[in-house]
Amino acid sequence: MFTTVRPQSTLTPPTANLIPNDLFTAINELKKDLNAVILAHYYQDPDIQDIADFIGDSLALSQQAASTNAEVIVFAGVHFMAETAKILNPDKLVLLPDLNAGCSLADSCPPEAFAQFKAQYPGCLVVSYINCTAEIKAMSDIICTSSNAVKIVNQLPKDRPIIFAPDRNLGRYVMEQTRRELILWQGSCMVHETFSEKKIVQLKIEYPEAEIIAHPECEPSVLRHANYIGSTTALLNYSQQSASQIFIVATEPGIIHQMEKETPHKRFIPAPAINNCACNECPHMRLNTLEKLYLAMKFKQPEITMDETIRLAALRPIQRMLEMS
């Protein structure tokens, strides 16, 4: 493994007496003491979103990480996001409240297997969705997010074949939008692949005036019913601008917190999963809590560290993305 983290063995085991009663105040005090910035993804719990200095999707968080003057970056997200912050900020302390906050999509693309896959298609440009490990980024020519994937692919030479990894659903969506053939790695997100088309159609029958808005990581069977498809930021913006008053939201329901804050008079219904859950929460994103956020800042652990060779190789395609965005 090239990407490593410092072990948590130096931490005092979290106990009730380590957690202050007023976590918001304690975290804000630590933030000042450390000259820290808290970056949070839209899929985090509402209380983490509310204490964050910046909330956004993967592209916005990458841009924020690249431009911050803070000495410490506390990333309330999942591992690949904290890795990206470290790639962009090798001299800063980057903390992830829970090291187990992984990503099923990133896990679906093991570096060794992807290297073999890439070798089968010499001469291809490799476009990798940011939801991947540092090792995959290091094997890529350019990184993209759901916000800019179509824009990125449209700017690439027409005479060069393209490998797109790791999300097959986003890849299919990009193919449709750009009318370019892509060689797709067959990865997927556990949240977005389990929305129930049948239940979504039933909801639409129950609320005929509702608009279905969906993330492009969703399966094609769901996307074909969507009135609007976009990244989390795009979905948030659309929900504010649309005249509709009811939305069926086919992405991780953490984004609904911001939607309700921006337009409290509108109704947002999380799209149901195939199973009996009322909605699709990402179990990895939800591992982060205010308590873990506080402890990470208090003990300056767990810290993201990385092999410099991998970091430099991964930095180049990220920088290309930021330049082309």
From Swiss-Prot:
A GO molecular-function descriptor: metal ion binding
Protein name per UniProt: Quinolinate synthase
Reported cofactor(s): [4Fe-4S] cluster
GO biological process, one term: 'de novo' NAD biosynthetic process from L-aspartate
Source organism: Rippkaea orientalis (strain PCC 8801 / RF-1)
GO terms under cellular component: cytosol
Principal location: cytoplasm
Pathway annotation from the record: Cofactor biosynthesis; NAD(+) biosynthesis; quinolinate from iminoaspartate: step 1/1
HAMAP family to which the protein is assigned, alphabetical: NadA_type2
Annotated residues for binding of [4Fe-4S] cluster: 103, 189, 282
Annotated binding of iminosuccinate, by residue: 41, 58, 129-131, 146, 215-217, 232
SUPFAM superfamilies: NadA-like
Function: Catalyzes the condensation of iminoaspartate with dihydroxyacetone phosphate to form quinolinate.
Family per similarity comment: Belongs to the quinolinate synthase family. Type 2 subfamily.
InterPro entries: NadA, NadA_sf, Quinolinate_synth_type2
Enzyme Commission numbers on file: 2.5.1.72
Key words of the record: 4Fe-4S, Cytoplasm, Iron, Iron-sulfur, Metal-binding, Pyridine nucleotide biosynthesis, Transferase
Domain of life from the UniProt record: Bacteria
Cell location: Cytoplasm
Disulphide connectivity of cysteines: none
Gene3D superfamilies according to UniProt: NadA-like (3.40.50.10800)
Cofactor note: Binds 1 [4Fe-4S] cluster per subunit.
